[in-house]
């Protein structure tokens, strides 16, 4: 460790604390630990050089060490400026793994760190990407476009693009082919979250996807667990740590009723809030109504609720006009990947009073205040520590299996977006049952024949909706 300096963390002295938390997390991540045991001898990721862009948490540290245990080399950055747990990053750095992340990065630092994961020593380029939100993939693709036409980064439309475009220009000034030289070596990407998956499908639709991609998000053991049950616990954890507010008796509006929104609504109702839901999709709206939630329009209830949570993955769902109407001390937060769901930029014209890290009072001219959490970024990671280890073991076991598949068999895939096969989805679930004392019933030969499925699965067709 004395000679290792290829990292940037808040405080390397936190490594001991981080290691203790990693040891605890491993006991709650049976899927990852079983995957280490199963594949360690084969070393299926030997030769893989993975550029990782995903929240640098304790749970992610267990993922990173699983990848390296299976033979991979890894360089890592966080995919959010507020989501890093500094002791986890320190533990990874102390283990000799390059990591570039600390809680509270500036946007300029964020994009510089995103470049760092592609800057491998001795001219060895990354050949795999593990992405969360698509920023690592976007960086190489946009930079490659800018090599041919600098005009694509000439006119930033927001603060994020300003930092990104400036970072690309700096690297092009050093090497006019910085991005294309790295892009050509990438064999594939595995994408963690809904927002990043949307980007990949759009690239595929436009014919611009440069390599195969595996959509980890839509594995059942990711989206129906991480997105639903993870958010069900981590949303209120973030709100409570940030504000100490009594949720019971409050009116809460959840914007979006997908898997994430469903988990958020359940947790808020479980603590005694009256929960309303906004939706654009009639099916999701009907689901919400059948669960007993009132389905409303934001422009009609902005002045009637106490807590607002965005969970849409879209842009501008809470507007400046909505916030002008809100009650004094209304709490506004987001649990979607990017900070675009709330029009935070429109609030910069007003006075900001920082209460503590990631908690701000926005003071309007009439003296009214609203409480903005994590500056509109992920509240569960900005104001708390994200999802529990057990549910992240589901998601990250999928990630490891996807990395193994793409690295070993990427040449068999077209430049399209794929999902993991059903038998692997069921395998991930199976690996987690014993930890919670669940025992499966086994089909008899007669029963298996009657419903026309193999005794050991898969048990459902690909189109089955869990």
Swiss-Prot record:
Keywords: Cytoplasm, Hydrolase, NAD, One-carbon metabolism
CC annotations in GO: cytosol
Pathway as given in its UniProt record: Amino-acid biosynthesis; L-homocysteine biosynthesis; L-homocysteine from S-adenosyl-L-homocysteine: step 1/1
Residues annotated as binding substrate: 57, 132, 192, 222, 226
Record keyword Transferase present: no
Biological process terms in GO annotation: L-homocysteine biosynthetic process; one-carbon metabolic process; S-adenosylmethionine cycle
A GO MF term: adenosylhomocysteinase activity
Source species, domain of life: Bacteria
Chief place where the protein resides: cytoplasm
Localization in the cell: Cytoplasm
Protein purpose: May play a key role in the regulation of the intracellular concentration of adenosylhomocysteine.
Name of the protein in its database record: Adenosylhomocysteinase
The organism of origin for this protein: Chromobacterium violaceum (strain ATCC 12472 / DSM 30191 / JCM 1249 / CCUG 213 / NBRC 12614 / NCIMB 9131 / NCTC 9757 / MK)
Lineage of origin: Bacteria, Pseudomonadati, Pseudomonadota, Betaproteobacteria, Neisseriales
């Amino acid at each position: 460790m004395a000679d290792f300096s290829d990292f940037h963390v808040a405080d390397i002295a936190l490594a001991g604390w981080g290691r203790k938390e990693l040891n605890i997390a491993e006991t709650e991540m049976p899927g990852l630990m079983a995957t280490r045991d199963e594949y360690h001898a084969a070393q299926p990721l030997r030769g893989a050089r993975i550029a990782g862009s995903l929240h640098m948490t304790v749970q992610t540290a267990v993922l990173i060490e699983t990848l390296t245990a299976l033979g991979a080399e890894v360089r890592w950055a966080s995919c959010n400026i507020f989501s890093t747990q500094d002791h986890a990053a320190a533990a990874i750095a102390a283990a000799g793994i390059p990591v570039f992340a600390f809680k509270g990065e500036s946007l300029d630092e964020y994009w510089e760190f995103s470049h760092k994961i592609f800057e491998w020593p001795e001219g060895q380029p990354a050949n795999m990407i593990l992405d969360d939100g698509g920023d690592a993939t976007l960086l190489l693709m946009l930079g490659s476009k800018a090599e041919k036409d600098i005009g694509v980064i000439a006119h930033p439309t927001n603060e994020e693009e300003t930092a990104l475009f400036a970072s690309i220009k700096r690297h092009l000034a050093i090497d006019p082919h910085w991005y294309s030289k790295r892009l050509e070596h990438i064999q594939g990407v595995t994408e963690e979250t809904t927002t990043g998956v949307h980007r990949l499908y759009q690239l595929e639709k436009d014919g611009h996807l440069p390599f195969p991609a595996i959509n980890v998000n839509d594995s059942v053991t990711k989206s129906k667990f991480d997105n639903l049950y993870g958010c069900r616990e981590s949303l209120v954890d973030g709100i409570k740590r940030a504000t100490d507010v009594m949720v019971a008796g409050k009116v809460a509006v959840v914007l979006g009723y997908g898997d994430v929104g469903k988990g958020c609504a359940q947790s808020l109702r479980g603590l005694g809030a009256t929960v309303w839901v906004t939706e654009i999709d009639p099916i999701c709206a009907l689901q919400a109504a059948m669960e007993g939630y009132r389905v409303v329009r934001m422009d009609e209830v902005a002045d009637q609720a106490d807590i607002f949570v965005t969970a849409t993955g879209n842009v501008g769902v809470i507007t400046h006009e909505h916030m002008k109407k809100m009650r004094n001390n209304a709490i506004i937060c987001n649990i979607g990947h990017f900070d675009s769901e709330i029009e935070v930029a429109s609030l910069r014209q007003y006075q900001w009073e920082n209460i503590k890290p990631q908690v701000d009072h926005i003071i309007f001219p009439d003296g009214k205040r609203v409480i903005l959490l994590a500056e509109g970024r992920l509240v569960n990671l900005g104001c708390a520590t994200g999802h529990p280890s057990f549910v992240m073991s589901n998601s990250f076991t999928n990630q490891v299996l996807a990395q193994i598949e793409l690295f070993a068999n990427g040449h068999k895939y077209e430049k399209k977006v794929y999902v993991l096969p059903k038998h692997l989805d069921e395998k991930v679930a199976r690996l987690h049952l014993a930890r919670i004392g669940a025992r499966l019933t086994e089909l008899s030969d007669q029963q298996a024949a009657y419903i026309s499925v193999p005794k050991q699965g898969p048990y459902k067709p690909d189109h089955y909706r869990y």
